[in-house]
Amino acid sequence: MRIHDLDPENRPRERFLRTGPASLSPSELLALVLRSGTRNNNIIDTCNALIARFGLERLADIPLSELQEIKGIGQAKAMQIIAVFELNKRIHYSRNLQRKVLSARDVFEYMAGRVPDITKEHLFVLHLNTKNQIIRNEQVTVGTLNASLAHPREVFKSAIRESAHAIILVHNHPSGDVEPSNADRQVTEILRQAGSFLQIDLLDHVIIGVDTWFSFREHSLLT
């Protein structure tokens, strides 16, 4: 069944105009973005298939080639999907750029949706001003954290350029287990010492998982 075959009152566009976007399902909202299906694929069914395969939460991180594996999703529609989620990320980033960080929970909430590929380990450095507001968020490395990847030169280079008062390290564990490894501890200590020499405080190192986090400061591992 095509959208035009539906009762007019039940079509996504008409319901949107009548009752607002909150009344539509995720598939219906996505259908409004993609607008039309193909001769053999209802756009609602196509959007249902997308969400069933990838899940709504993961849809923002699926690459172009994988989106096109869904019947009815060509390159143009896959680009539309990625563009919508990318725009949302940038809006979220802009709103939170000078967010004040007072705890590891603040860091965890700030980083929600900012890890581009949760199947890989990423190291980010948050630059803070004297009011503990984030003035920059920089991705430094991709891959298992170790001393060669997280060299003080790379970590502090932009912090010096931005005249940051302090930094917070953030990295994710793809496994979801946020317990720090020996390498995590060693890298943190090396960077703490480097920050002390440069007079740029390392306020915390926060390891994030899917729904939890580990704070070096809260566990008294930064002295």
From Swiss-Prot:
Region (Disordered): 1-20
GO biological process: proteolysis
Motif, JAMM motif: chain positions: 171-184
Residue span(s) of domain MPN: 100-222
GO molecular function: metal ion binding; metallopeptidase activity
Comp. bias intervals (Basic and acidic residues): 1-17
Record-linked InterPro entries: MPN, RadC_JAB, RuvA_2-like, UPF0758, UPF0758_CS, UPF0758_N
Domain of life of the native organism: Bacteria
Keywords, ordered alphabetically: Hydrolase, Metal-binding, Metalloprotease, Protease, Zinc
Residues that, per the record, bind Zn(2+): H171, H173, D184
SUPFAM superfamilies assigned: JAB1/MPN domain, RuvA domain 2-like
PANTHER family given in the database record: DNA REPAIR PROTEIN RADC, UPF0758 PROTEIN YEES-RELATED
Family: Belongs to the UPF0758 family.
Protein name: UPF0758 protein Cpha266_1761
Protein source organism: Chlorobium phaeobacteroides (strain DSM 266 / SMG 266 / 2430)
